[in-house]
Amino acid sequence: MSRSSPSGKGHSRMAEPRFNNPYFWPPPPTMPSQLDNLVLINKIKEQLMAEKIRPPHLPPTSASSQQPLLVPPAPAESSQAVMSLPKLQQVPGLHPQAVPQPDVALHARPATSTVTGLGLSTRTPSVSTSESSAGAGTGTGTSTPSTPTTTSQSRLIASSPTLISGITSPPLLDSIKTIQGHGLLGPPKSERGRKKIKAENPGGPPVLVVPYPILASGETAKEGKTYRCKVCPLTFFTKSEMQIHSKSHTEAKPHKCPHCSKSFANASYLAQHLRIHLGVKPYHCSYCDKSFRQLSHLQQHTRIHTGDRPYKCPHPGCEKAFTQLSNLQSHQRQHNKDKPYKCPNCYRAYSDSASLQIHLSAHAIKHAKAYCCSMCGRAYTSETYLMKHMSKHTVVEHLVSHHSPQRTESPGIPVRISLI
């Protein structure tokens, strides 16, 4: 550069300022391969610093991938558009941000993205987002909005991907960007909030799945609780299912008595009923010679000998007690003085006569002698009384069988008269 004479020193400075000299302001590079030596050294230093703070899950870069980064540009190309670092620092009043940056796109891409082209853009120092400059560089640049990053992250992004995109080939760039499924800055941050579960759908977009189970409305079963059928050993998880199953026992009674038309839900009830026909009384009283078919009947009879009356009247002033619960319930109805209509058979009381008449009709059916003997014609209110009566005919059965022409069935089977 030629300096002006002392006589025209002030005029030459005004005509040609020293900072407008092409020595300090080289033309910007037009191709990524024309990076100046200063930018190359700074990028290599920043990349080495990024290697020191690299996360432990990323392996160190191989020598083959670092070798192209250490190759300086050709002397012919660098002589036109390079300047050394000491000369730049000696110039007073020159700001650091005035250093021309390479025309390379600085976009934060995900780890699985691929580079489709060289997006050429200029990065401003104070703004994290970059814009494409289609007129300054080549005409192949495409504008892509970048993700806002912090100062440290933008420095790391500008250190390695920018330099690699200008020197290495696209296949090698893709392999470096996707080391172990992570980017150069490590694994991506996990999103806050509830994660949405997406089902894999290879033929179309991902299908959204609700991340919590949908419970059906209605009765739900409690944990660890089961309901057992009272007739059979089956168990159920809900009470409603057990009740539905219990109806099958009440409606269908498969155990039928061979001596009469009765049927029962289980075998134990049938065995208890067969004692009436067979006359078996396995429960004997220890105080007398009486025997009973059921244990409950023996217990009620034993209270007569012991004088035990466990069922006491709770009404104030009444000291009566009874051996059976049914007798106590009949006695308690006598204390209902607000119901003047009382039943003469069971001491029940009602507030009106219509209710009493309905109750008396039930007594008429209950005390009706529906069980009739086929040999002598006598009738009884219960089948038990009829069986006791039938035992008297066993002695002269062979004689009576020849003198009863109206008998239609065998003498051992009772006939029940249906009431209308």
Swiss-Prot record:
One of its GO terms (biological process) is regulation of transcription by RNA polymerase II. GO terms for molecular function: DNA-binding transcription factor activity; RNA polymerase II cis-regulatory region sequence-specific DNA binding; zinc ion binding. There is a cross-link at K198 (Glycyl lysine isopeptide (Lys-Gly) (interchain with G-Cter in SUMO2)). Keywords: DNA-binding, Isopeptide bond, Metal-binding, Nucleus, Phosphoprotein, Repeat, Transcription, Transcription regulation, Ubl conjugation, Zinc, Zinc-finger. Pfam families: zf-C2H2. One of its GO terms (cellular component) is nucleus. Residues 1-28, 54-80, 115-155, 178-202 are annotated as: Disordered. It comes from the Eukaryota. Signal peptide: none annotated. Gene3D superfamilies: Classic Zinc Finger. InterPro entries: Znf_C2H2_sf (IPR036236), Znf_C2H2_type (IPR013087). A zinc finger (C2H2-type) spans 227-249, 255-277, 283-305, 311-335, 341-363, 371-393. The keyword Calcium does not apply. Residues 121-154 have a biased composition (Low complexity). It is found in: Nucleus. Its main location: nucleus. The modification Phosphoserine is found at S404. The modification Phosphothreonine is found at T162. May be involved in transcriptional regulation. Belongs to the krueppel C2H2-type zinc-finger protein family. This is Zinc finger protein 362. It comes from Homo sapiens (Human). The gene is ZNF362.
